[in-house]
């Protein structure tokens, strides 16, 4: 029984688990993509693997692109300064 659990766990680790999150997509140096139109953000987000995106008006970081179900390998805005 223990072998079955260990083999199942090993298979899970080998296949990898792709997770997603909702967040502001980030430029290099932890800056958000500024926006005025939802279409711009939706295109940007979907090109980076998200389900969709929209322009978050007057949000925490100003007018920035918010992505829905963005893959983990795409950088997101994290707390701290934007270093332009």
From Swiss-Prot:
Q: Does the keyword Nucleotide-binding apply?
A: no
Tissues expressed in: Expressed by the venom gland.
Enumerate the UniProt keywords alphabetically. Cardiotoxin, Disulfide bond, Ion channel impairing toxin, Neurotoxin, Secreted, Signal, Toxin, Voltage-gated sodium channel impairing toxin
- Show the InterPro entries listed in the entry: LCN-type_CS_alpha_beta_dom, Scorpion_toxin-like, Scorpion_toxin-like_sf, Scorpion_toxinL, Scorpion_toxinL/defensin
Outcome after substituting residue 29 to E? 1.7-fold decrease in toxicity to mice, and 0.8-fold decrease in the binding affinity for insect sodium channels
Check the record and name the SMART domains matching this protein: Knot1
Which cysteines share a disulfide bond? 31-82, 35-55, 41-65, 45-67
Which N-terminal stretch is annotated as signal sequence?
1-19
- What superkingdom heads the lineage? Eukaryota
The effect of residue 24 to G is: Complete loss of toxicity to mice, and 70-fold decrease in the binding affinity for insect sodium channels
Outcome of swapping residue 40 to G: 1.9-fold decrease in toxicity to mice, and 1.4-fold decrease in the binding affinity for insect sodium channels
Instruction: Offer an example of a GO molecular function term for this protein.
Output: sodium channel inhibitor activity
Return the similarity comment. Answer: Belongs to the long (4 C-C) scorpion toxin superfamily. Sodium channel inhibitor family. Alpha subfamily.
Name it.
Alpha-like toxin BmK M1
Q: Which organism is it from?
A: Olivierus martensii
């Amino acid at each position: 029984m223990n072998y079955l659990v260990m083999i199942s766990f090993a298979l899970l680790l080998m296949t990898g688990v792709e997770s997603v999150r909702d967040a502001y997509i980030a430029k290099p140096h932890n800056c958000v993509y500024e926006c005025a139109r939802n279409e711009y953000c939706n295109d940007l987000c979907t090109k980076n693997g998200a389900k969709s995106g929209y322009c978050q008006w007057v949000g925490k970081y100003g007018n920035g692109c918010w992505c829905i179900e963005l893959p983990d390998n795409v950088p997101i805005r994290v707390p701290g300064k934007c270093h332009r």
